[in-house]
Amino acid sequence: RKMDARVLDLCSGSGCIGCAIADALPQTRVVLSDVSPEAMDVSRHNVNRNGLEGRVSFMLADVTKAPPIMTGSFDLVVSNPPYIPTFDILTLDPSVRDYEPVWALDGGEDGLDFYRAILKNWKGVIRQGGMLMFEVGEDQAGDVKDLMRMAGLHDAQSIKDTRGVERVVTARA
Protein backbone atom coordinates (compact mmCIF):
# COMPACT_ATOMS: atom_id res chain seq x y z
CA ARG A 1 0.00 0.00 0.00
CA LYS A 2 3.05 2.25 0.09
CA MET A 3 2.30 4.86 -2.58
CA ASP A 4 5.94 5.72 -3.36
CA ALA A 5 7.04 2.10 -3.57
CA ARG A 6 9.86 0.79 -5.69
CA VAL A 7 8.68 -2.14 -7.81
CA LEU A 8 10.66 -4.68 -9.83
CA ASP A 9 8.90 -6.64 -12.59
CA LEU A 10 11.02 -9.72 -13.37
CA CYS A 11 10.50 -11.62 -16.65
CA SER A 12 8.57 -8.52 -17.65
CA GLY A 13 8.10 -9.39 -21.31
CA SER A 14 6.01 -6.61 -22.87
CA GLY A 15 5.95 -4.76 -19.55
CA CYS A 16 2.17 -4.84 -19.16
CA ILE A 17 2.19 -5.72 -15.44
CA GLY A 18 4.78 -3.11 -14.50
CA CYS A 19 3.09 -0.48 -16.69
CA ALA A 20 -0.27 -1.20 -15.06
CA ILE A 21 1.27 -0.74 -11.61
CA ALA A 22 2.99 2.51 -12.63
CA ASP A 23 -0.24 3.81 -14.16
CA ALA A 24 -2.38 2.91 -11.14
CA LEU A 25 0.10 4.29 -8.58
CA PRO A 26 1.70 7.47 -9.99
CA GLN A 27 4.17 7.86 -7.07
CA THR A 28 5.57 4.38 -7.66
CA ARG A 29 8.81 3.78 -9.54
CA VAL A 30 8.99 0.57 -11.56
CA VAL A 31 11.92 -1.32 -13.05
CA LEU A 32 11.06 -3.68 -15.92
CA SER A 33 13.55 -6.52 -16.26
CA ASP A 34 13.86 -9.25 -18.85
CA VAL A 35 16.60 -11.39 -20.38
CA SER A 36 15.44 -10.57 -23.92
CA PRO A 37 16.54 -7.36 -25.65
CA GLU A 38 13.54 -7.76 -27.97
CA ALA A 39 11.16 -7.89 -25.00
CA MET A 40 12.84 -4.77 -23.58
CA ASP A 41 12.21 -2.99 -26.90
CA VAL A 42 8.51 -3.88 -26.70
CA SER A 43 8.47 -2.70 -23.06
CA ARG A 44 10.03 0.64 -24.03
CA HIS A 45 7.39 1.10 -26.71
CA ASN A 46 4.60 0.35 -24.22
CA VAL A 47 6.06 2.69 -21.60
CA ASN A 48 6.28 5.52 -24.15
CA ARG A 49 2.83 4.77 -25.55
CA ASN A 50 1.34 5.04 -22.07
CA GLY A 51 3.23 8.18 -21.06
CA LEU A 52 5.13 6.47 -18.24
CA GLU A 53 8.62 7.72 -19.11
CA GLY A 54 10.52 8.93 -16.08
CA ARG A 55 8.67 6.55 -13.75
CA VAL A 56 9.57 3.27 -15.42
CA SER A 57 13.14 2.17 -16.11
CA PHE A 58 14.65 -0.90 -17.74
CA MET A 59 17.17 -3.55 -16.75
CA LEU A 60 18.39 -6.36 -18.98
CA ALA A 61 18.95 -9.25 -16.57
CA ASP A 62 18.74 -13.03 -16.34
CA VAL A 63 16.84 -14.37 -13.31
CA THR A 64 18.94 -17.54 -13.38
CA LYS A 65 21.97 -15.44 -12.40
CA ALA A 66 22.77 -13.15 -9.47
CA PRO A 67 21.09 -9.74 -9.66
CA PRO A 68 23.11 -6.66 -10.60
CA ILE A 69 21.26 -4.58 -7.97
CA MET A 70 21.56 -4.03 -4.25
CA THR A 71 19.96 -6.02 -1.49
CA GLY A 72 16.67 -4.67 -0.18
CA SER A 73 16.14 -2.27 -3.09
CA PHE A 74 12.45 -3.03 -3.75
CA ASP A 75 9.19 -2.91 -1.81
CA LEU A 76 7.50 -5.23 -4.29
CA VAL A 77 8.78 -7.76 -6.80
CA VAL A 78 6.28 -9.13 -9.33
CA SER A 79 6.85 -11.79 -11.94
CA ASN A 80 4.92 -13.71 -14.55
CA PRO A 81 7.77 -16.08 -15.46
CA PRO A 82 7.65 -18.93 -17.95
CA TYR A 83 5.65 -21.64 -16.13
CA ILE A 84 4.48 -24.14 -18.75
CA PRO A 85 6.02 -27.60 -18.19
CA THR A 86 8.28 -28.44 -21.14
CA PHE A 87 6.24 -31.42 -22.29
CA ASP A 88 2.97 -29.43 -22.22
CA ILE A 89 4.11 -26.79 -24.70
CA LEU A 90 3.17 -28.86 -27.74
CA THR A 91 -0.37 -29.26 -26.39
CA LEU A 92 -0.95 -25.51 -26.02
CA ASP A 93 -3.52 -23.77 -28.15
CA PRO A 94 -1.84 -22.63 -31.40
CA SER A 95 -2.82 -19.03 -30.61
CA VAL A 96 -0.38 -19.21 -27.67
CA ARG A 97 2.16 -21.79 -28.89
CA ASP A 98 2.69 -20.17 -32.28
CA TYR A 99 2.68 -16.56 -31.03
CA GLU A 100 5.11 -16.63 -28.09
CA PRO A 101 8.75 -17.71 -28.34
CA VAL A 102 9.31 -21.08 -26.62
CA TRP A 103 11.77 -19.55 -24.13
CA ALA A 104 8.97 -17.25 -22.91
CA LEU A 105 6.75 -20.25 -22.11
CA ASP A 106 9.04 -23.12 -21.04
CA GLY A 107 9.26 -23.36 -17.26
CA GLY A 108 11.26 -26.59 -17.28
CA GLU A 109 10.20 -30.16 -16.64
CA ASP A 110 7.69 -29.30 -13.88
CA GLY A 111 7.10 -25.66 -14.87
CA LEU A 112 8.73 -24.37 -11.67
CA ASP A 113 12.33 -23.68 -12.79
CA PHE A 114 11.95 -19.89 -12.92
CA TYR A 115 10.23 -19.69 -9.53
CA ARG A 116 13.15 -21.61 -8.04
CA ALA A 117 15.68 -19.35 -9.79
CA ILE A 118 13.99 -16.13 -8.69
CA LEU A 119 13.70 -17.33 -5.10
CA LYS A 120 17.33 -18.47 -5.05
CA ASN A 121 18.90 -15.49 -6.81
CA TRP A 122 16.57 -12.51 -6.41
CA LYS A 123 14.64 -12.74 -3.14
CA GLY A 124 17.33 -10.62 -1.48
CA VAL A 125 16.37 -7.55 -3.53
CA ILE A 126 13.08 -7.38 -1.59
CA ARG A 127 13.29 -5.12 1.47
CA GLN A 128 12.37 -6.65 4.83
CA GLY A 129 8.57 -6.72 5.00
CA GLY A 130 8.29 -6.26 1.25
CA MET A 131 6.27 -8.54 -0.98
CA LEU A 132 6.88 -11.01 -3.79
CA MET A 133 4.00 -11.77 -6.18
CA PHE A 134 4.07 -14.50 -8.82
CA GLU A 135 1.57 -15.34 -11.51
CA VAL A 136 1.30 -19.13 -11.57
CA GLY A 137 -0.06 -21.78 -13.88
CA GLU A 138 -3.11 -23.85 -13.10
CA ASP A 139 -2.43 -26.28 -10.22
CA GLN A 140 0.94 -24.67 -9.40
CA ALA A 141 -0.09 -22.39 -6.51
CA GLY A 142 0.50 -24.97 -3.77
CA ASP A 143 3.96 -25.89 -5.06
CA VAL A 144 4.97 -22.25 -5.47
CA LYS A 145 3.75 -21.38 -1.96
CA ASP A 146 5.86 -24.28 -0.65
CA LEU A 147 8.91 -22.99 -2.55
CA MET A 148 8.35 -19.53 -1.08
CA ARG A 149 8.15 -20.91 2.45
CA MET A 150 11.27 -23.03 1.94
CA ALA A 151 13.06 -19.88 0.73
CA GLY A 152 12.25 -18.18 4.03
CA LEU A 153 9.36 -15.98 2.91
CA HIS A 154 6.29 -15.59 5.13
CA ASP A 155 2.50 -15.41 4.83
CA ALA A 156 2.32 -17.23 1.49
CA GLN A 157 -1.19 -16.85 0.07
CA SER A 158 -2.93 -17.28 -3.24
CA ILE A 159 -5.43 -15.12 -5.11
CA LYS A 160 -8.01 -16.64 -7.45
CA ASP A 161 -8.76 -15.33 -10.92
CA THR A 162 -12.26 -14.73 -12.30
CA ARG A 163 -12.60 -18.47 -13.06
CA GLY A 164 -11.80 -19.39 -9.46
CA VAL A 165 -8.31 -20.67 -10.32
CA GLU A 166 -5.45 -19.81 -7.95
CA ARG A 167 -3.52 -17.52 -10.32
CA VAL A 168 -1.37 -15.27 -8.12
CA VAL A 169 0.78 -16.29 -5.16
CA THR A 170 2.11 -13.72 -2.70
CA ALA A 171 4.53 -13.83 0.22
CA ARG A 172 6.42 -11.38 2.44
CA ALA A 173 10.15 -11.10 2.98
Where are these regions (language model features)?
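Class I S-adenosylmethionine-dependent transferase superfamily signal
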Residues: I21, V96, I118-W122
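Conserved Class I SAM-dependent methyltransferase catalytic core
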Residues: E109-R172
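C-terminal beta-strand of the catalytic ATP-binding
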Residues: Y83, R172-A173
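Structural signal for short hydrophobic segments within the conserved structured cores
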Residues: S57-M59, W103, Q157
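Mobile active-site "lid"/loop adjacent to the S-adenosyl-L-methionine
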Residues: Y83-D113
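Alpha/beta-hydrolase-fold catalytic nucleophile elbow
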Residues: N80, Y99, E135
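Glycine-centered flexibility sites
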Residues: D9-G18, A61, P82, G107-G111, ...
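Conserved SAM/SAH cofactor-binding pocket of Class I
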Residues: R1-T91
